[in-house]
Amino acid sequence: MAEFPFEISPMFEGERVRKEGMFVELGGPKSLGLELVRAADMDAIEDDKVTIVGPDLKDMEEGKTYPWAMIFNIGGELVEPDLESVVERRVHDFINYCQGIMHLNQRYDVWMRVSKDTAGKMDSFEPFGKAVMMLFKTELPFIEKMQVTFYTGKEEVEKQMELAKEIFKARDARTKDLHDEDVDVFYGCTLCQSFAPTNVCVVSPDRISLCGAINWFDGRAAAKVDPEGPQFEIAKGDLLDAVTGEYTGVNEIAKKLSSGEFDKIKLHSFFDSPHTSCGCFEVVGFYIPEVDGIGWVDREYQGMAPNGIGFSTMAGQTGGGKQIVGFLGIGVNYFYSPKFIQADGGWNRVVWLPSGLKAKIDEAIPADLKDKIATENDATDIASLKDFLEAKNHPVVATWAAAEEEEEEEEEEEEVAVAAAPMMMPAAGFQMPAMPMMSGGSGGGIKLTFKNAKITIDKLVISEKKEKK
């Protein structure tokens, strides 16, 4: 558009600004990043006003990372506090319409980059702010007036961050007494499909969006004021499984929105047809087979999990709108859900959390498990994690003995089967070839153990090996 120094179009959604093409980075994993929308009286808003508190774009050094906070105030006859988070989530959309400006995540995890090319066309964030507000008022006509303040100084961003977290906490508390069985409809969101085309985000009273920004009430408000927008109703349909959270309506929308890639989503399952994961999730869960437990790591944690992998690597494996068995992206508020991964043990399956995340969700953790869940201060690898869980008698430890007994029973069954094999009568005319003894050295042979494996063999050919003369 001519009045702005950069092009604006939905075609730029999904555009990535790589490090080598970046002028500055705002927020992200190395700093603080925040976005917040607040409803206000019309008289308190100066329409289209952009205020910059701290260094402006022209004052920033190329290649550096700066703290960043965006506070939008909106007003209008139909504007109410229930719409704040709905409008807030569209920030992701509209910023990504701006060429050369990348926006990821939400709330207190915002990560932005401005490309060198775009920075070369403007020396201030003001035209960027005006462009985003223009898009908001064009796409969401119930917004009659809007203003924005950008904060780029660390002290002020930290102050705004603390205020915002209290607001987010109050929003999330609204669904505490409402559950999946109490409503007839859930809500879907397709905001992340520009980055994760097959992602199907289902928001229910007991499961907040992966990004943590949209709860059931937010979805309802969004679908009401913007019926053609990215949030929409999902008819629950019939309940197929109350434990896993499987509904016919959710399965139908999963198949439709993923273009047939998935035909079912179980809202409260970690392993069996789990919810898809986009890339905006706040936390990623990962299965640790050595202890038969599940660990969780959030964006704020910069270290390695006991499996030797950090958040960014696991996020790359998990995201993209896929169902990756063994990994699961969630919003932080899902930890507070009474249906939290209930199909796979719930909190009794959780074995590791970063200390910062553990402190943040302290109220969600059952009292009898708080000292049994390890952090990076207790376990940094699988061996130390196993020792910790054993010492604390974590619930998963009981499954280890059961697994060992099962393995022993399987070995006994195998031995019986081998002993009985010579007694089996072959079909007439068929001579079983002599089978050579497999040896693994002094250890007494080779042992193969398959657990929970599904093996399909179309054809098995056993033939005698003839030596060359």
Swiss-Prot record:
Catalyzed reaction equations: Co(I)-[corrinoid Fe-S protein] + acetyl-CoA + H(+) = methyl-Co(III)-[corrinoid Fe-S protein] + CO + CoA
Domain of life: Archaea
Keywords attached to this entry: Acyltransferase, Iron, Iron-sulfur, Metal-binding, Methanogenesis, Nickel, Transferase
Pfam families, per the entry: ACS_CODH_B_C, CdhC
The EC number(s) this enzyme carries: 2.3.1.169
GO molecular function: acetyltransferase activity; anaerobic carbon-monoxide dehydrogenase activity; CO-methylating acetyl-CoA synthase activity; iron ion binding; iron-sulfur cluster binding; nickel cation binding
Co-factor requirement: [Ni-Fe-S] cluster
Binding positions ([Ni-Fe-S] cluster): 189, 192, 278, 280
Pathway entry: One-carbon metabolism; methanogenesis from acetate
Function: Part of a complex that catalyzes the reversible cleavage of acetyl-CoA, allowing growth on acetate as sole source of carbon and energy. The alpha-epsilon complex generates CO from CO(2), while the beta subunit (this protein) combines the CO with CoA and a methyl group to form acetyl-CoA. The methyl group, which is incorporated into acetyl-CoA, is transferred to the beta subunit by a corrinoid iron-sulfur protein (the gamma-delta complex).
HAMAP family xref list: CdhC
Protein family membership: Belongs to the CdhC family.
Subunit-level organization: Monomer. The ACDS complex is made up of alpha, epsilon, beta, gamma and delta chains with a probable stoichiometry of (alpha(2)epsilon(2))(4)-beta(8)-(gamma(1)delta(1))(8) (Potential).
Name recorded for this polypeptide: Acetyl-CoA decarbonylase/synthase complex subunit beta 1
Gene encoding the protein: cdhC1
